[in-house]
From Swiss-Prot:
Subcellular compartments: Cytoplasm
Reaction equations catalysed: 3-methyl-2-oxobutanoate + acetyl-CoA + H2O = (2S)-2-isopropylmalate + CoA + H(+)
Summary of subunit composition and partner proteins: Homodimer.
Keywords: Amino-acid biosynthesis, Branched-chain amino acid biosynthesis, Cytoplasm, Leucine biosynthesis, Magnesium, Metal-binding, Transferase
Enzyme Commission code(s) on record: 2.3.3.13
Protein name: 2-isopropylmalate synthase
GO molecular function: 2-isopropylmalate synthase activity; acetyl-CoA C-acetyltransferase activity; magnesium ion binding
EC category name: transferase
PROSITE patterns linked to this entry: AIPM_HOMOCIT_SYNTH_1, AIPM_HOMOCIT_SYNTH_2, PYR_CT
Region described as Regulatory domain: spans on this chain: 456-588
Protein's gene: leuA
Function: Catalyzes the condensation of the acetyl group of acetyl-CoA with 3-methyl-2-oxobutanoate (2-ketoisovalerate) to form 3-carboxy-3-hydroxy-4-methylpentanoate (2-isopropylmalate).
Source species of the chain: Clavibacter michiganensis subsp. michiganensis (strain NCPPB 382)
Length: 588
């Protein structure tokens, strides 16, 4: 098939490919052959990078709620602010320290530019802390050097080195604090790799790390400028060109301008990084920082402990939405309201069969479903592991099929419909969705099912219907196996008593109906208990041919024999209703 696409007419002449701006050449890359086997060190920057991107920055109260959430989840390095940039951030850092809010195993991180009065204020904010990371940065990219700072490479190096020296000097003013260092060549992705390595190596020399007290070198995609593999190549190249690699923690800080921050973080980690900075649900400047929730649960679904607790994901989401005053989109990876929901009929059928197969496998092994590997089509994670229920997994609209409808009836009402009945009832539901549009919730599906198969009082169905109603039954059997059936049967406005014999209650009842002038042939019969308890209701499903019409009936009763007879009544009444309705529809 020949493509019919045509040029867009957009001004592509204004833009240069990344490879024409920054050379990243690593033909002997090794990262594609590696596998992730353990979680990286995480640093949550919601309170600094995330907060500065909010239309309405967090109040001190919301900041504290966010900090406490991050601690509960298990983050051990948390960037809590830019204390020299605002009194609000300074006061928040002080409140965490003075109120004893920082657990002993959690290290706060504070950001500062490489200017003396800002560095002095930063160290002042840290007095009394047990330990802290001072995060020093200055911008290094070609564009920033030329447009913002109007200086050369040496000028940028001088800024970084002076900042590092000042940090070491002011460290002496807070001897009670165990100070660690992080340096970021901001706008790293727009910086020549040779220059990025040079400035990082020079800063490391000033900060004097050891293998026991490493310095963090953070290599941010401040603006995402290329595909994730290019970022990974640059990280592997940097790891090879750091003079004191064994004294350095290589950290990643991807932004999501091109929509590939998660991939960039994962590939950069493969390429040799040790640590990743990001925000819950990808909050942050422009299109956001890398999503720590997506990264963590990605690991979890590969059988790797993220070392972060996502077991109450909806609670995490609610808290983040409150603090950020931003909604988490419905399709946000792992956390959105619709990410475990299937509307498509084929997807629903596969999910239903997946649940059934897992239950069967677990039963065969004599274990619970939670003790065997998760394997359900279209659900790469068990929603219950993240605190979700199965209620929203399958939802029904005009795109849905028999699998979704059958799943909801089984999940919510314990009805395990035979396959041909699933097909029949899904057609009934499809007619509703086509006529009314939108989604049909489980409660409405149950109402439709009752109206179609289980004639009931008017407060439970759309309309009272059905020629026949079974009001009482009595059976007896002789030693020869013959069953005698006596029934009280409402036929329209009259109540009749009738009796017949057969090789079982069903056969006898079919004779009763034949005596009433109704020709019924039984094609299939299935029954099951609605629960495992001794007083469980029984559900019976019968496939009938009534006056040449083939359809199903359903009966539910405490007695399985009565349920089977009610199922026959259901099928007969449906056949009669169909013959009444078809002329009405033809006349419309």
């Amino acid at each position: 098939m020949k493509s019919t696409q045509t040029p867009s007419g957009m001004p592509i002449h204004k833009y240069r490919p990344f490879h024409e701006q920054i050379a990243v050449d690593l033909p002997d890359r090794t990262w594609p052959a590696r596998r992730i086997t353990e979680a990286p060190r995480w640093c949550a920057v919601d309170l600094r990078d995330g907060n500065q991107a909010l239309i309405d920055p967090m109040s001190p109260e919301r900041k504290r709620i966010m900090f406490d959430l991050l601690v509960r989840m298990g983050y051990k390095e948390i960037e809590v602010g830019f204390p020299s940039a605002s009194q609000t951030d300074f006061d928040f850092v002080r409140s965490l320290i003075e109120e004893g809010a920082i657990p002993d195993d959690v290290t706060i991180q504070v950001l500062t530019q490489a200017r003396e009065h800002l560095i002095a204020r930063t160290y002042e904010s840290l007095r009394g802390a047990k330990q802290a990371i001072v995060h020093l940065y200055n911008s290094t990219s070609v564009l920033q050097r030329e447009v913002v700072f109007r200086t050369d490479k040496q000028g940028i190096i001088d800024i970084a080195l002076e900042g590092a020296r000042l940090c070491k000097r002011y460290e002496e003013t807070i001897p009670e604090v165990d100070v660690y260092y992080e340096y970021s060549p901001e706008s790293y992705t727009g910086t020549e790799l040779e220059f990025a390595a040079e400035i990082c190596n020079r800063v490391v020399e000033v900060l004097e790390p050891t293998p026991e007290r490493k310095v963090i070198l953070n290599l941010p995609a401040t603006v995402e400028m290329a595909t994730p593999n290019v970022y990974a190549d640059s990280i592997e190249w940097m790891c090879r060109h750091l003079d004191r690699r064994d004294e350095v923690i290589v950290s990643l800080h991807p932004h999501n301008d091109r929509g590939t921050a998660v991939a960039a973080a994962e590939l950069g980690y493969l390429a040799g990084a040790d640590r990743i900075e990001g925000c819950l649900f990808g909050n942050g400047e422009r299109t956001g920082n890398v999503d720590l929730v997506a990264l963590g649960i990605n690991l979890f679904t590969q059988g790797i402990d993220p070392q972060i607790d996502f077991s109450d994901l909806d609670g995490i989401k609610r808290t983040a939405e409150h603090c950020n005053q931003l909604a988490v989109p419905e399709r946000s990876p792992w956390a959105g309201d619709l990410v475990y929901t299937a509307f498509s009929g084929s997807h629903q059928d596969a999910i239903k069969k997946g649940f059934e197969a897992m239950a069967a496998d677990a039963a065969a092994q004599g274990v619970t479903v939670d003790e065997i590997p998760w394997a359900v089509p279209y659900l790469p994670v068990d929603p219950q592991d993240l605190g979700r229920s199965y209620e929203a997994v399958i939802r029904v609209n005009s795109q849905s099929g028999k699998g979704g409808v059958a799943y909801l009836l089984k999940a919510d009402h314990s009805l395990d419909l035979p396959r041909r009945l699933q097909i029949e009832f899904s057609g009934v539901v499809q007619a509703k969705t086509d006529a009314e549009g939108g989604e049909i919730p489980s409660a409405q599906i149950w109402s439709i099912f009752q109206d179609e198969y289980l004639p009931a009082p008017l407060d439970r169905v759309e309309e009272k219907w059905g020629r026949f109603e079974l009001t009482s039954t009595r059976t007896s059997s002789d030693m020869g196996g013959s069953v005698s059936l006596e029934v009280e049967l409402r036929d329209g406005d009259r109540v009749r008593e009738a009796s017949a014999s057969g090789n079982g209650p069903i056969a006898a009842f079919l004779k009763v109906l034949a005596d009433q002038g109704v020709d019924v042939r039984l094609l299939d019969y299935v029954e099951h208990a609605l629960s495992a308890s001794g007083d469980a209701l029984a559900a019976s499903y019968v496939e009938l041919e009534v006056e040449g019409v083939r359809l199903w009936g359903v009966g539910i009763d405490e007695d399985s024999s009565t349920a089977s007879l009610e199922a026959i009544v259901s099928g007969v009444n449906r056949a009669i209703r169909r013959t009444v309705r078809e002329p009405e529809l033809a006349a419309v």
